[in-house]
Amino acid sequence: MSTPNLYDSTNKPLYGERLIEESKIICFDNPNKKRIYEISIELPEFTCKCPFSGYPDFAKLNIFYQPNSKVYELKSLKLYINHFRDLKISHEEVVNRIMDDLLNAAAPHWIHLNADFNPRGNVSMKLDIYSGQKRN
């Protein structure tokens, strides 16, 4: 029995790469639709690539939301976010795309997506998008 070559040069994607490539946001039923509550999710290792230089951009994403009938499943959200790591896309476009996908997946009562990009060349950027009415 031979040991598998971990550094095989074939172009066959590894299992983690396949999971990321096939990822989509999965939701499950809100366990308490009658209660108003807020969920916060932090994704501290977001990456994508600058569409002009190809250099990696790093950010911390924060999602704050008040669920409607669905809540986000965290593992699927992690895999979905990871699929942007090799994509050449602007900060503004990627954050708006993520917000659109979050809205389409769960249609929360209210949601706030915050992206805090690491400084590059002495410039940092924060981007906030809101949708819906926050309930009290």
From Swiss-Prot:
<protein>
    <recommendedName>
        <fullName>NADPH-dependent 7-cyano-7-deazaguanine reductase</fullName>
        <ecNumber>1.7.1.13</ecNumber>
    </recommendedName>
</protein>
<feature type="active site" description="Proton donor">
    <location>
        <position position="57"/>
    </location>
</feature>
<dbReference type="Pfam" id="PF14489">
    <property type="entry name" value="QueF"/>
</dbReference>
<keyword id="KW-0560">Oxidoreductase</keyword>
<dbReference type="GO" id="GO:0005737">
    <property type="term" value="C:cytoplasm"/>
</dbReference>
<keyword id="KW-0671">Queuosine biosynthesis</keyword>
<dbReference type="GO" id="GO:0033739">
    <property type="term" value="F:preQ1 synthase activity"/>
</dbReference>
<keyword id="KW-0521">NADP</keyword>
<feature type="active site" description="Thioimide intermediate">
    <location>
        <position position="50"/>
    </location>
</feature>
<dbReference type="GO" id="GO:0006400">
    <property type="term" value="P:tRNA modification"/>
</dbReference>
<dbReference type="InterPro" id="IPR016856">
    <property type="entry name" value="QueF_type1"/>
</dbReference>
<dbReference type="InterPro" id="IPR050084">
    <property type="entry name" value="NADPH_dep_7-cyano-7-deazaG_red"/>
</dbReference>
<comment type="function">
    <text>Catalyzes the NADPH-dependent reduction of 7-cyano-7-deazaguanine (preQ0) to 7-aminomethyl-7-deazaguanine (preQ1).</text>
</comment>
<keyword id="KW-0963">Cytoplasm</keyword>
<comment type="pathway">
    <text>tRNA modification; tRNA-queuosine biosynthesis.</text>
</comment>
<feature type="binding site">
    <location>
        <begin position="91"/>
        <end position="92"/>
    </location>
    <ligand>
        <name>substrate</name>
    </ligand>
</feature>
<dbReference type="GO" id="GO:0008616">
    <property type="term" value="P:queuosine biosynthetic process"/>
</dbReference>
<feature type="binding site">
    <location>
        <begin position="72"/>
        <end position="74"/>
    </location>
    <ligand>
        <name>substrate</name>
    </ligand>
</feature>
<dbReference type="InterPro" id="IPR043133">
    <property type="entry name" value="GTP-CH-I_C/QueF"/>
</dbReference>
<comment type="similarity">
    <text>Belongs to the GTP cyclohydrolase I family. QueF type 1 subfamily.</text>
</comment>
<dbReference type="InterPro" id="IPR029500">
    <property type="entry name" value="QueF"/>
</dbReference>
